[in-house]
Amino acid sequence: MYSEWRSLHLVIQSDQGHTSVLHSYPESVGREVANAVVRPLGQALGTSSVAGSESLLKTDKEVKWTMEVICYGLTLPLDGETVKYCVDVYTDWIMALVLPKDSIPLPIIKEPNLYVQSILKHLQNLFVPRQEQGSSQIRLCLQVLRAIQKLARESSIMARETWEVLLLFLLQINDILLAPPTVQGGIAENLAEKLIGVLFEVWLLACTRCFPTPPYWKTAKEMVANWRHHPAVVEQWSKVICALTSRLLRFTYGPSFPPFKVPDEDANLIPPEMDNECIAQTWFRFLHMLSNPVDLSNPAVISSTPKFQEQFLNVSGMPQELSQYPCLKHLPQIFFRAMRGISCLVDAFLGISRPRSDSAPPTPVNRLSMPQSAAVNTTPPHNRRHRAVTVNKATMKTSTVTTAHTSKVQHQASSTSPLSSPNQTSSEPRPLPAPRRPKVNSILNLFGSWLFDAAFVHCKLHNGINRDNSMTASFIQILLSYKSSIATQASMEFRRKGSQMSTDTMVSNPVFDASEFPDNYEAGRAEACGTLCRIFCSKKTGEEILPAYLSSVILNSPPLFCCDLKGIDVVVPYFISALETILPDRELSKFKSYVNPTELRRSSINILLSLLPLPHHFGTVRSEVVLEGKFSNDDSSSYDKPITFLSLKLRLVNILIGALQTETDPNNTQMILGAMLNIVQDSALLEAIGCQMEMGGGENNLKSHSRTNSGISSASGGSTEPTTPDSERPAQALLRDYGSTDSAAGLLIRSIHLVTQRLNSQWRQDMSISLAALELLSGLAKVKVMVDSGDRKRAISSVCSYIVYQCSRPAPLHSRDLHSMIVAAFQCLCVWLTEHPDMLDEKDCLKEVLEIVELGISGSKSKNSEQEVKYKGDKEPNPASMRVKDAAEATLTCIMQLLGAFPSPSGPASPCSLVNETTLIKYSRLPTINKHSFRYFVLDNSVILAMLEQPLGNEQNDFFPSVTVLVRGMSGRLAWAQQLCLLPRGAKANQKLFVPEPRPVPKNDVGFKYSVKHRPFPEEVDKIPFVKADLSIPDLHEIVTEELEERHEKLRSGMAQQIAYEMHLEQQSEGELQKRSFPDPVTDCKPPPPAQEFQTARLFLSHFGFLSLEALKEPANSRLPPHLIALDSTIPGFFDDIGYLDLLPCRPFDTVFIFYMKPGQKTNQEILKNVESSRNVQPHFLEFLLSLGWSVDVGKHPGWTGHVSTSWSINSCDDGEGSEPDEITSSEDVGASIFNGQKKVLYYADALTEIAFVVPSPVESLTDSLESNISDQDSDSNMDLMPGILKQPPLTLELVPNHTDSLNSSQRLSPSSRMKKLPQGRPVPPLGPETRVSVVWVERYDDIENFPLSDLMTEISTGVETTANSSTSLRSTTLEKEVPVIFIHPLNTGLFRIKIQGATGKFNMVIPLVDGMIVSRRALGFLVRQTVINICRRKRLESDSYSPPHVRRKQKITDIVNKYRNKQLEPEFYTALFQEVGLKNCSS
């Protein structure tokens, strides 16, 4: 209003009219001169009034010299009569402008205006506070003020310059006394009412006789803003503005308009001679003289004035707290009084007020305020931050709201309000608004910005516009009253007696304790809300309220349906109508000039999010018609009939779909996408229940359902046409009729079609929307609803098309963010394939998916429509990036290894085999097997084969060659027990191997045996006669001598013995031959016996073709090793690295820590103790926990447990010994603390991720002996195949646990203790980035900002933060803000309100849960789990250092190859294959 005018502050500061020449002399000189000069004048003044003597001063020089002395005398202490004489003299002399007297010097009578101006400046010195004699100063100040009043009222010759000096004098003395913080019992507190009263009265007189120029109005407005911590300022302002309004209404609306009567005392403040034009100008300027009255609710603004700042530092230089100033404790009452004054003005313009008997402004009788209990029982939030509000006074149509955070002030809820009286019943009819009342828009133009801002006092704001949920029930009247008729208004009034409260009563009231005063502004808020209600209720038929105000209602009411307000559901149909007007409108042209269309749509979407669960939750419960269709434009509107909540579902769904089609803002779009998954999943769960139950019942049963905590009854799943009140129909029938339009399958199909179409058109350029759309598609894939395969194929095909488009974008557009979108698309594709593996049974779908995988790995497709087929071997790999290639490889692994194979018989906790070298060694039957009995080979630099050639001695057939292979690849550790199968399995037991067919026994009967003496010559030789020649040869005896005869005899004897011996041997041989069986095993021909010892590793590699010379050669022009290499397991550290590799998970793992927070709790110990007993928590909390995952034993669990010290272990406890503690636990009420990670955790896993849900609880400290035992057990362990953090007893091949755990259940360490006990220097894999999410169940929503997350950081340790390269100092400052928190607040309706903190990052918000959403009991667990998965996936996408699990494993395999490769020549390699392993190390 006065922006182009200059304030008079500089003029006032530079004016030295209040100083005297005596100020230049020593203080003793001035005091003596003043005492000597002023005493005769004062005494003469006392006698002159009786004797009529003239003044001692005759000339102008004498008067001016004397005035210099009096000016100094007014600054003296009040211990003497000097100051009193000075005041007496000056109050007598200023009457020269009223009625000249003889006691007044003649020069003053001649030029009264000039001298009075100087006197007024001198009198400022009197009002400077003194340290003592406060009562004397008050008496003298009142004497001056009464003289000023008389001067202004009665003077008729006062010039404009004198009026201006008089106004500046009053402004200055008010500023001197009222601007600083009030001192209790001080002069300012006693004079405040009189000071401000005189100022306003004189100002009104000046308006009549000499209207102040704009600089004076601007100066007055600025100075009054510094005095508002005095109740009298607002009180006097309220009186003046009401008196002016009473006069204004007389000539503005004529005599027929209901008069606005004010007390005569207040009416007399307005000079009778003030004309109508002057009244109007003065009224508008006085209305804004108080500045923005909403500032009165903010102590930070009130205490930011210069005088406050001067005293803001104490003597030690330390700033004081705001609560140190008692005057600020009055602000709630002052704020209420200001709002009440504005309320009276509104009532006056509406013509619905009646006069009051006291001096306060009138009390409106048409108060549509809530009963006192409604305002009192609403607990205000703790630690609310103050809010500074700035209003554009030029237009008065919109307000710019900014937030200023100051120190938090604790408070407690008060049971009574000192500003409100008990409820009273009006005994007379409530008057209707005047027929000639102004339009609603006109009143809102004047007071709207103040009232709307006052209605949100101490309500936290987000992004400057979106209000949080801290509104009390009072503001809800704005909306209730807007659609309510006056005839149906409640008869209870909420009357406040604020004006009748004395200052002493207010100060002594305990409600104004220093720690509570900022939160007692509800009375002023309620007054503003009630005023807005009356404004909206006075809308005439056919009158249109400006979009600026209607949009403000929508803009400021997103949490309206989240606050457990009784009866708020009455306005649901009307809000739906408003949303149908706003959200489908793409342009919102009629609202653009008043609000930001994006913010308006965002608020509308927030309201929609809170309305979506209502149809399913309340079902066919009818909404009672209390509005009677009074505000419907159509007389035949369905609003006149009872409607069911379920009948609103189709309208809400259509609004949701329409909003998505017209929305362009990324944040708003993501909120809608989150809502879509909410409604689809809720519908699917409801229909699943409805199909299982056939429930009949009357309306009473349905109504009772809506009031109970079940929330999952099939009755709420029914459907009824809006005009058919079939509330007694069974759920199945209702679902059947309603399913044709918005069943779960229909919603799923509509969602898939709309999202996939926009994903590949409008959204593919926007990263945040694309990620949210892909997350929605991933969530829709998990919805258990039967839909046609064509719709599922559409989703898969759209994701593939999205990947093709992103990969084909020009190279300059490729960035990390773009590749993150492609990676997210591959992850979405994996979700669809694992949830619907049968989709790959279709040839075209399989082809499309594999082409996308090929595109991701190689950078191009082998077959394009316009090109010839290019074989993969001929292509040069050129992927979009290594991250894209890694994502495509993970998809290929998912297709080849997980589809149809998950979960495995070992359970979903581990997709890997639960055996390792330690297990195989322990349960093989050969004592010679040890860790060196394994042969280690590497295939293609990516797969490590650990081969055990000795048979395990179990169900394997020992006759056949067998080999046990531990395959460690990118996808995990797999164990294969293989045998060379040479015969059909059924033939092994029935055939005798290697035994020839039996032959008949030979016949030994060969006939008669004849004894024939064989002759050397035939018998005919003896018959031949001798000739003479024959006789020439002598006989032997003739020529044998005696010597020869002896020799001959020896020879004959020897020959006889030999013949006898040979005969004996022949007979013996014949006897043995007769005794020998047939066939002779010595001479019989039979097949060779089977081999008993095999080098099965060599056979295995050879049979698979790995032992070719080409496989052993180094590739040309490449740094890669050969296709097959051997590893040397004797090198120190080999088995540690193998165990390190086994520690690397093959799936992403996430951790969720769940807390329960009862009302008023602020410390971590209080919160942790809540879960120790089920009696301390709500039953829904335990149900919610079990909906997140299933319970697993930490000691037996092979998956992620929430801490690295117990995760991914293939060891277990003995069933017999482990069951006893479980039985003891089940007999005790341990509540949710059983899932604190010591014995059990809640666990969820699918093919792509695993989550551990931990409920931290207090843990007693361990004794020193226990700590030493733990260290001893670690050091004594002989399982050196794994790193120390996983040295626990092994598991058998049959998965039969037979060993006790290393620690008893009572001795287990809490997560925080484990973090501290983890030994330094032990290898911990690089598992980051750490993905932790906290879920907090809060019974009271206002306690959210009190949640001690920083104190609980030690309880949400996973051990990942202990990895190398992590700085302790860095963790302490970054961990808290890196942990997203999901707050869940149960509403009285059985629904749940969601609050998200810290889940926004580089990629904006995460769905499906968004801030402010309302969720049903059915869908809560699913949505929380899905949100956690998406949050952690987003976090991994954001991280520059994150590598997928298969990449980390591949890198570790490469590292192992480089460190332990056995660099042998081909002959040496082949030679080693034929050598035995392990025998030389049997003793090791």
From Swiss-Prot:
Recite the UniProt keywords alphabetically.
GTPase activation, Phosphoprotein
The organism sits in which domain of life?
Eukaryota
Location of region: Disordered? 355-437, 699-728, 1297-1325
For bias type Polar residues, the affected ranges are 369-381, 392-428, 701-725
- Its protein name is Ral GTPase-activating protein subunit beta
Occurrences of domain Rap-GAP (ranges): 1138-1382
PANTHER family per record: RAL GTPASE-ACTIVATING PROTEIN SUBUNIT BETA
Q: Which residues carry this modification: Phosphothreonine?
A: T363, T379, T724
Gene Ontology terms: cellular component: cytosol
Q: In this chain, where does the modification Phosphoserine occur?
A: S359, S421, S710, S1275
Q: Which Pfam families match?
A: RALGAPB_N
Q: List the molecular function annotations (GO) for this entry.
A: GTPase activator activity; protein heterodimerization activity
Low complexity compositional bias, start-end? 1302-1313
Coiled-coil residue spans: none
Transferase recorded as keyword: no
Is DNA damage set as a keyword in this record?
no
An example of a Gene Ontology BP annotation on this entry?
A: activation of GTPase activity
Q: In which tissues is it expressed?
A: Abundantly expressed in testis, pancreas, lung, thymus, brown fat, and white fat. Expressed at lower levels in the brain.
User: What binding partners and quaternary form does the record give?
Assistant: Component of the heterodimeric RalGAP1 complex with RALGAPA1 and of the heterodimeric RalGAP2 complex with RALGAPA2. Heterodimerization is required for activity.
PROSITE patterns membership: RAPGAP
Question: What does the function comment of this entry state?
Answer: Non-catalytic subunit of the heterodimeric RalGAP1 and RalGAP2 complexes which act as GTPase activators for the Ras-like small GTPases RALA and RALB.
